[in-house]
Amino acid sequence: MNFLRKIVKNCRDEDTQKPSPVSAPLDDDDLWLPPPEYVPLKELTSKKNRRNFCINGGVKVCSPNGYSFGILRHILRSFDEIYSGNHRMVGLVKVVIGLALSGAPVPEGMNWVYKLRRTLIFQWADSRGPLEGEELEYSQEITWDDNTEFVGLQIRVSAKQCHIRGRIWCINMNSRAGQLWSDMSLQTQRSEEDKDSSLLLE
């Protein structure tokens, strides 16, 4: 049985003296799907509980022998149980993780880094979401290890409210991000005022 637990040791680069080449990510069992779409810039009807955030996020995957998205999805299915950040912004963190992992990774030693830098519009239902002016600096290390394979994740999300015009993210379930949001049980509902946008319920 596979166990999920917080990393005890840091996920770090292998020694540079080792001559072994970096392994590419293993072929995944899942179908590679297109990245999520962003709704074109437009004026939103709904003004309440809406925030623009300048996002700087990333996920570093540490795995000496490569990795598959099946393992990443397995780890993220337990995200609610292991999340250690501000719970008023857990929905935002899930959105950022999904969007970051839908991009192309950059190799760093034996690690693979997915980054996301973007200004996004988030809307929360009712009185949910962050307080006015609240910011987020979240980082966490998570590992998956079944004695035959080790995969470590370093998740980092910086979110600052800003007045730069952002894009509305939307849920395209036929995308890698959509799969990951489903795995993390992202709670949303469609906005009644703006049919193309989603309201976060967490």
Swiss-Prot record:
GO terms for cellular component: host cell cytoplasm; host cell endomembrane system; membrane; viral envelope; virion membrane. It comes from the Viruses. Residues 115-151 are annotated as: Essential for glycoprotein binding. The record marks V95 as: Involved in the inhibition of stress granules formation and contributes therefore to virulence. Keywords: Apoptosis, Host cytoplasm, Host membrane, Host-virus interaction, Membrane, Viral budding, Viral budding via the host ESCRT complexes, Viral envelope protein, Viral matrix protein, Viral release from host cell, Virion. It is found in: Virion membrane; Host endomembrane system; Host cytoplasm. A motif (PPXY motif) lies at residues 35-38. Gene3D superfamilies: Rhabdovirus matrix protein M2 (3.10.460.20). The keyword Membrane applies. Homomultimer. Interacts with nucleoprotein and with the cytoplasmic domain of glycoprotein. Interacts with host ATP6V1A; this interaction plays an important role in virion uncoating after viral entry. Most abundant protein in the virion. This is Matrix protein.
